[in-house]
Amino acid sequence: MVHSKVVIIGSGAGAHTAAIYLSRAELQPVLYEGMLANGTAAGGQLTTTTDVENFPGFPSGIGGAELMDNMRAQSERFGTEIITETISKLDLSSRPFKMWTEWNDDEGSEPVRTADAVIIATGANARRLNLPGEETYWQNGISACAVCDGAVPIFRNKPLYVIGGGDSAAEEAMFLAKYGSSVTVLVRKDKLRASNIMADRLLAHPKCKVRFNTVATEVIGENKPNGLMTHLRVKDVLSNAEEVVEANGLFYAVGHDPASGLVKGQVELDDEGYIITKPGTSFTNVEGVFACGDVQDKRYRQAITSAGSGCVAALEAEKFIAETETHQEAKPVL
């Protein structure tokens, strides 16, 4: 069992920004990036994005996987120890905090590591619908983030579709209307769940329309490597009538699932499972436990906001360690 001053759990923009700051502060952070943790490859949601055009410093854009590879390399350059294992169990009841990986979490097994501070940066996963053709055209027409992807060339002046009936769906549809030739929102039920003001704005928007009692049943597109989505099969749930419509973009606005199960019952969560942090900080309700990135951000969920919150978490963890612990080399716990 090894002791570290600070452990970061996660592998996205928030986790690596925290690692960069902490390693530059010579705190020798350890980052557990996971091995398909929560079903996502190391690097988080950005690894599923082909082109990132809104992250500062890349005027021509950059691939999501390449951006995360660069962040990982920068973390390692300054001395972060990156471990490709998944933390499966945490004990946050007292310091030093204890943790186990998926390889040694049997009942009664010794923790693999202890830490004075822990940063939770486990992210959130966009819900998918598992439609036929979804896997083929994911990021080749299908996206779960209009703000991230809506401005890319394949969507400009093309018919776009949004699935969802809440405020997020309305907001994303109106955002996409800046780029697409038209935006159609598919709502399974006969009314919107969105707030009255958002529903009114959506229904009044000249480039947006809503199809109630309608679901998507299949994504159709080019039959070639990296082929693009071109059509969508939709069904009226009342009559069961189906039709194929022209659609060059499909955006899911059906929610996200925060990867907070690791700390459930130990750290305060909201009713959707997001970690609650003190406003303007990364502090959780457990002293010495910090959270950053999408696991605590249900509103923005952007790479740049995740990176910013990772910086905040690192600075606050550094201050916490300086105030409560003496600076010393990580060493085995006897």
From Swiss-Prot:
GO terms for biological process: removal of superoxide radicals. Its cofactor is FAD. It is an enzyme of class 1 (oxidoreductase). FAD binds at residues 11-14, 40-41, 45, 54, 148, 294, 301-303. InterPro entries: FAD/NAD-bd_sf, FAD/NAD-binding_dom, Ferredoxin-NADP_redctase_2, Pyr_nucl-diS_OxRdtase_2_AS, Thioredox_Rdtase. Keywords: Disulfide bond, FAD, Flavoprotein, NADP, Oxidoreductase, Redox-active center. Disulfide bonds join 145-148. GO terms for molecular function: thioredoxin-disulfide reductase (NADPH) activity. Its EC number is 1.8.1.9. Pfam families: Pyr_redox_2. GO terms for cellular component: cytoplasm. Binds 1 FAD per subunit. SUPFAM superfamilies: FAD/NAD(P)-binding domain (SSF51905). PROSITE patterns: PYRIDINE_REDOX_2. It catalyses: [thioredoxin]-dithiol + NADP(+) = [thioredoxin]-disulfide + NADPH + H(+). Component of the thioredoxin-thioredoxin reductase system which may be involved in biosynthesis of penicillins and cephalosporins and may be important in determining the thiol-disulfide redox balance. Homodimer. The active site is a redox-active disulfide bond. Belongs to the class-II pyridine nucleotide-disulfide oxidoreductase family. This is Thioredoxin reductase. It comes from Penicillium chrysogenum. The gene is TRR1.
